[in-house]
From Swiss-Prot:
Pathway(s) per entry: Metabolic intermediate biosynthesis; chorismate biosynthesis; chorismate from D-erythrose 4-phosphate and phosphoenolpyruvate: step 4/7
Keyword NADP annotated: yes
Subunit structure: Homodimer.
Short name of one Pfam family: SDH_C
Active site: 73 (proton acceptor)
Protein name: Shikimate dehydrogenase (NADP(+))
Gene Ontology MF: a single term: shikimate 3-dehydrogenase (NADP+) activity
Biological process, per Gene Ontology: amino acid biosynthetic process; aromatic amino acid family biosynthetic process; chorismate biosynthetic process; shikimate metabolic process
Length: 288
């Protein structure tokens, strides 16, 4: 698309609350322009009480697909006509597409985005995931699909850890106070907690890290440290990891690749310019 909207322009979008700071519109519209596709990706702020009406409305106006972000990733499940098995396992949907017979299907491209930077890793790498919330569920599913393991999850909520083990019995859960015992065995560390995130307009979170430098020093030499946070870039966790000789991976990779997977799905499997999406996201981040 050349930037001009016509009567035949197709709509894609994002629903969430809020959506003002999302990088997705910049990423998707840059890719669509580079591909010459007559589509426009629009963010739609949708309050929880309006979710059902919004999902029906998007179908009514012929939207060709949409992403789902906080706080709707779980709440949207009963509103969909079909849910892919991996999304059902994770208990969350972030990408919705229309079924040929009508209605909506949901999948979870967060899993695809998460695994992309890890493709090529040997199987059986001991993995420790920090956090037991929704992001941890996508990370667990991704690690298991890659054949990594043992996969351990460290969290502070016994109930959340129990729920994870009920979904994935092969995953070992660890009380946060005991995680130091497992660091020396860890070759892949994944942070799914929000600790260290910088929110626009607020200094809170700057300088924070879920693990100390001393704890990072206990990791297996040359470990991979993957922080799902991408603001600031690098995060304190990744900066310290790099200084200690570990391999850092930014959460921006997950964001870009989940978006690319979703866009390809909406466009019938066409290849998507990932680098264009990455550059658009980085440019948008530089404005924050």
């Amino acid at each position: 698309m050349d930037g001009r909207i016509s009567g035949s322009t197709q709509l894609l979008g994002l629903i969430g609350d809020p959506v003002a700071h999302s990088l997705s519109p910049a990423m998707h519209n840059a890719a669509l322009a580079a591909m010459g596709e007559n589509y426009c990706y629009v963010p739609f702020p949708v309050a929880p009480k309006h979710l059902a009406a919004a999902v029906a409305g998007l179908a009514a106006i012929g939207v060709r697909g949409f992403n789902v972000t906080i706080p709707h990733k779980q709440a949207i499940l009963p509103l969909l006509d079909q849910i892919e098995s991996r999304a059902a396992a994770v208990g969350a949907v972030n990408t919705v597409y229309p079924l040929p017979e009508g209605g909506w299907a949901g999948t979870n491209t967060d899993i695809d985005g998460f695994v992309q930077p890890l493709l090529g890793l040997e199987k059986g790498i001991p993995t420790l995931i920090l956090g037991s919330g929704g992001a941890a569920r996508a990370a667990i599913q991704g690690c298991l699909e890659l054949g990594l393991g043992p996969v351990r999850v460290a969290g502070r909520s016994p109930n959340s850890l129990l729920a994870l083990q009920q979904t994935w019995p092969q995953v070992e859960t660890v009380n946060w106070a005991e995680l130091n015992c497992y660091l020396s065995q860890t070759r892949l560390l994944v942070n799914t907690t929000p600790v260290g995130m910088h929110k626009p307009g607020s200094p809170a979170g700057q300088g924070l890290s879920p693990l100390s430098r001393e704890q990072l020093g206990l990791l297996s030499p040359g470990a991979i440290v993957y922080d799902l946070i991408y603001v600031p870039d690098p995060t304190p966790l990744l900066r310290m990891a790099a200084e200690l000789g570990h391999t850092p991976i930014s959460g921006l990779e997950m964001l870009v690749h989940q978006g690319a997977k979703a866009l390809s799905l909406w466009l019938g499997g066409k290849p998507v310019p990932v680098e264009v999406m990455r550059q658009a996201a980085q440019h948008q981040l530089a404005q924050v």
